[in-house]
């Protein structure tokens, strides 16, 4: 079974997807983390100056794919954690994700991950592009104000003000929705859940109710 959870940043995708995967004992794939890993590697010297095709042919980053284990990111063998949470990396990931060759590279990896079986994927094009035949497709949304407050908790203190972050989110939304390749859209047969006034537990309960109702 494949469940996809799409939506813009700050809607609770990652936390919800992980909670759902834990509850169902499914594998969990955070595709945003995958794009940020690529972006982090691309920002480092000398990879920043390599032609993109060469960079993707011999990437200095890697991921662990194992049943029942969280997806981990590595750069030259070094485990990446807080390095992926900076605004610089987020901005670079947004720019690189516009490129069709980057998206094709990542989508291939994501489909390979699905071979583990019983997966929850979260991202921006999981239900619309990567897994259009997923068993259940969720699209999370939330107000920009709420999303900015949530994202602030993931950033180092003093990085951005709530107003600055909200502006960044709106800018990213526009870029995601308007990109030529695999834009952020509600997938066909996707179910929209507004998480603005909901806790993660409440969102999780809504998704579980859908699963049980449809006997998936």
From Swiss-Prot:
Q: Which superkingdom heads the taxonomic lineage of this protein's source?
A: Bacteria
**Gene Ontology molecular function: any one:** CMP kinase activity
Question: Which processes are annotated in GO (biological process)?
Answer: pyrimidine nucleotide metabolic process
**Keyword Cytoplasm, does the record have it?**
yes
Q: What is its EC number?
A: 2.7.4.25
Catalytic reaction equation(s)? CMP + ATP = CDP + ADP; dCMP + ATP = dCDP + ADP
> Which InterPro entries does the record cross-reference, listed alphabetically?
Cytidylate_kin, Cytidylate_kinase_dom, P-loop_NTPase
Query: Which residues are listed for ATP binding in this entry?
Result: 7-15
Its GO CC terms are: cytoplasm
What name is this protein filed under?
Cytidylate kinase
